[in-house]
Amino acid sequence: MTGPTNAMITDGTLLVHCSANQALRCAPVAERPGAGLVVSPHQRDEAGLLATAAYLLRQRRFEAPLLLDAARYAGQARLPASAPFNPRWLRRQRELGLPVLTDSGYVDSGDEPGLAGILHRTAVLPGTIAVLPLHPAWLQDRLHRTVLTGHIRAAGVPVALVLEAGRDPFALPGVVEGLLAVLGCGVPTLLLRCDVSALGALCHGAVAAAVGTVAGLRHLTPRTPPPRPGARPHGFRPVAPSAVFRPTLSYRRIGAIARAHRGRPDPELFGCACTVCDGRDVDWMAALSDRDREVPAFEHSIRVLQDLRDELLPRDRPTEQPPGTAARSWTARCADAEYRSRELGWDAAPMLRHWQRHGPTGAAAATRPAA
Ligand SMILES: [Zn+2]
C-alpha cells in the first residue's frame, strides 16, 4: 500500500498512534524501518492536525509512513456511521501525499446500514482506506462477524479497524477470533489504537497496526452515560503511566513493576536493553514523578514493541520464513508471557490466552519458558 508521495506502508508495519500535540516528540521514535505514525487531532482540532502533518512533511522532512485519523468516531460528541465523509478532509490528505483514511463515524452494534454505508462510500473513492470504528460485538458475536466479513469482502477496499472497549478489546472473548476472520477476507487490513495485541495482528497478516502513546489511544473508549440527575460530578483523574513489561507482554504500572522487582531481584527479568533504559532495570522510571515518567515510559514501550516485532517478523529476510512462522512464534511468546505473569504473582493479560486459543495449533505445546 502506498501514498502518492509519503513513504510506503510495507507489510508488518508497527505504527505509533499519537495526538497532534505529541507528533513532533513521537516523530523520531516512528522514523525507523517498518515503523510510522498515525496522528489524531488534539481536542478535536482537525485544522491543527493538518497543519502539524504539513509541518512534519515539509519542514521536518518526516520520511516514514504518516496517517491522519480524524477520530470523529470518538468522544462524547462522536458522529454515527451514517455521517457523510467530509470531502475536504479526504482531499487534504491526498494533497499532502498521504494514504487517505475516511473520517468515519462510529458503527454501533445494531448499525448494519451504517457499516455497509462506510464501505460502499469508500469503494467509489480511489485508493482510500475505510476506517471502521466498531462496537466489539461486530467481532465477538458470530452472527455480527458473518455480516461484517460479508460486507468487507463485497466492498473489497482496505480497512482500518478501531475497536471499542473500556480497556483492552482483545481481553474480550471472541475479539481475537473476529479479527482473524477479518484478516481472512483478503483485503489489506490495518488496526489503529491498539496495544501489545498489535504484534499479534501483524503476525497474523495485518498490513499495519498502531500502538497508542497513552491509554486513551490504545482502544476506543466507550462514551460515558450522562450523569444521573442529582449525581455528584466526578472530576478528571489522570491515569498513572504504564509501560510495556517485556517478559509478560503487557502494559503494567511502573509502581507494580518496581514492587515485583523488590520481591524478585532477577537481573534477567528486569534489565532492559532498549535505547531509553540503556541496560538499566526497567523500573528506574519509578524514581520519576508521574508527569516526568510519561515520555520515557512511552518511548521504552514503543522501542520494546519494535524490537519484538523485528524478532517475530524479521524485516531483512521476510521471504525466508515459511508461512505461519510468525503466528506460531507469537503463540509461543503468549504462552511464555502467561507463565511469567503467574511466576510474578500477577494475573496474566487475558489476551494472552485468547491469542493462544486461536493461534496455530501445536505451537503452545512446543513452548518452553526461557530460563
Ligand atoms: Zn526499556
Feature names for model-found ranges:
Residues A201:
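Conserved, mostly hydrophobic/aromatic
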Residues L172-V187:
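Donor nucleotide-activated moiety binding/catalytic core segment of transferases
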Residues G212-R228:
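Catalytic or ion-translocation cores adjacent to nucleophile or general acid/base/metal-coordination motifs
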